[in-house]
């Protein structure tokens, strides 16, 4: 019920705000939009999905929102963690997505957590963090409850391999 209410509030906000409607129009024009249904079908049917596309096609900003909105549309809650290779990326991508959704970072469904800084609300459904932050969370004593609460883990920019991302993929395997 709460999930449907959140989705309805977002739709109403977009419908009543011309600047948000303009942002939604631009989102619809991104190249990744053409593959939205295929991506969501793959996510629903598989435990692991690899999404590849050219730089700027919208993978980073749109795929997490597609997954979140799909969960809400189907009456399911979502707890999505999306890793970024750098702290600045985790911060800027989360701010961009919050802006696209007409929300304030850390006071909405979108937040970020980096080393020594966290902007996350109790309603956060889409958390951006570095690979290192997620790795530490998964290897902590509370990792069992964390794993049970997460619905999706998105590792962005995996081709930019580093030690944290390599260990993260091993642990998730």
Language-model features: where?
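Conserved P-loop NTPase motor core
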Residues: 12-173
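Interdomain "pre-motor" coupling segment immediately N-terminal to P-loop NTPase/helicase cores
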Residues: 1-15
